[in-house]
C-alpha cells in the first residue's frame, strides 16, 4: 500500500469531511471553487479510489454516492503499519519515530498502550 496521490488525497480529505455519502458533482463543485479541475478528472479519480477499495459507492438515480470504506485514522494506521513492515529494524524505526513526537503525542501513545494492557501503565 502506498499513500494517496495529490488529487486522491484532496478528494479523500473532502469525502472524510462529509457526514453523508457525496456525489462526484457535489465534490467537483467544492473542489472547483478553489482550483480549475475538470468534472471528468474528479469522476475518474473517485472511480479509481473505488476500484482500489478506498471508496464505497451506491447508485442513486444516474449518479453514485461515495463514502470512505475506512476512516482517516484507519488509513493512517495502515500507513504506519506499512512503514514498520518495510522500514528495516522495527525497534530502530520505532525509536526514530518516538524521537520525533511531541509530549502530547507521547501521552496519547502511553494512554493507548495502557488501554491495550487492560489499564496497566505502559
Predicted regions and their residues:
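Pre-recognition alpha-helix immediately N-terminal to the DNA-recognition helix
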Residues: 9-14, 26
